[in-house]
């Protein structure tokens, strides 16, 4: 069963976030049947990012935190784009493209084209393959969502 829980922030932002999550689920993971996504709108800018995505206690649980002030400070488009970026990370984790390992120290692993996982823990943020992919995908997904949901 797919469970989506959105909390914090303004009611209109919670509604928009839930719509965006379901949109990405339908578009990128239509066959996924067991996923638990919890999105909290809270202050994250002070922590150095508009949003964060973490794996939960099991492989089907994801926690997203997004700054609750994005829509007011930068506009609705920025909030949607941030949600889409973090949902790309959910997709990466749910499909096995990215893994976090904790045994023997924390490691962030990425499945390369040859099918092997490689450790990118010490790679600069802007060069981490999951971030490169998420930044590349967030714009087109946001644009399509805005068009399909008549937010343009």
Label every PLM stretch briefly:
Residues 12-35:
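Zn2+-dependent metallopeptidase catalytic core
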Residues 64-83:
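Short pre-active-site segment immediately N-terminal to the catalytic Zn-binding motif
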Residues 20-23, 91, 137, 141:
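Short alpha-helical scaffold segments that flank and stabilize functional sites
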């Amino acid at each position: 069963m797919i469970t989506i829980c959105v909390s914090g922030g303004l009611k209109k932002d919670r509604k928009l976030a839930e719509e965006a999550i379901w949109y990405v689920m339908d578009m990128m993971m239509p066959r996924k049947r067991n996923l638990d996504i919890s999105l909290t709108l809270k202050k994250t800018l002070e922590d150095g990012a508009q949003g964060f995505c973490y794996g939960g206690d099991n492989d089907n649980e994801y926690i997203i935190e997004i700054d609750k002030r994005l829509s007011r400070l930068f506009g609705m488009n920025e909030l949607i784009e941030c949600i889409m970026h973090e949902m790309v990370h959910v997709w990466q984790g749910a499909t096995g493209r990215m893994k976090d390992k904790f045994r023997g120290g924390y490691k962030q692993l990425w499945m390369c084209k040859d099918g092997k996982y490689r450790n990118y823990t010490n790679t600069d943020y802007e060069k981490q393959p999951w971030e490169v992919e998420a930044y590349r995908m967030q714009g087109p997904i946001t644009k399509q969502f805005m068009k399909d949901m008549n937010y343009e």
